[in-house]
């Protein structure tokens, strides 16, 4: 991961680790007021999202378009075909737009729990997301520090220029 410039505005997000049956850190996000969980995986070379998740009416995903099929090699070294899409989600008050590889098998991101009810994860935020936003993961404090998205950064105000607006 790249180092985050200390003068660059950042967002600090808490994540859960060691959740029952899930080894990767888990981050809670939102879209249209709907809670979404993503795994954070520094070893994933792509971002992944479940296809059945994209069809949830609560998310109002009618603007999401799936791109043409692409080929990729999985961990089993077998060539697979999948679609990609852009998906926007919210972290705090900021919106992040990311490109995802669509996973057609939703069972790949469901985890069993002791209650018997599976825990559903929308997808995986991998190296593309973590690198793009200069992510720094602190496993001791369970915090993720990421850069704010372009175009959504707080404007830098210069006191002299603000005062010039008020001169008579």
Tell me the role of every PLM-derived stretch.
Residues 1-168:
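Pepsin/retropepsin-fold aspartyl endopeptidases
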């Amino acid at each position: 991961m790249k180092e985050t410039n200390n003068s660059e505005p950042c967002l600090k997000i808490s994540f859960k680790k060691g959740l029952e049956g899930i080894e990767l850190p888990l981050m809670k996000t939102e879209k249209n007021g709907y809670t979404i969980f993503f795994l954070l995986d520094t070893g994933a070379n792509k971002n992944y999202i479940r296809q059945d998740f994209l069809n949830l009416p609560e998310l109002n995903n009618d603007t999401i378009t799936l791109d043409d099929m692409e080929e990729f090699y999985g961990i089993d070294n077998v060539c697979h075909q999948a679609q990609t899409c852009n998906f926007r989600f919210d972290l705090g008050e900021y919106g992040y737009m990311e490109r995802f590889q669509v996973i057609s098998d939703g069972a790949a991101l469901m985890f069993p729990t002791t209650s018997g009810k599976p825990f559903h994860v929308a997808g995986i935020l991998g190296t593309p997301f973590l690198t793009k936003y200069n992510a720094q993961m602190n496993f001791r404090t369970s915090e993720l520090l990421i850069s704010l998205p372009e175009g959504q950064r707080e404007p830098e105000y210069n006191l002299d220029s603000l005062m010039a607006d008020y001169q008579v």
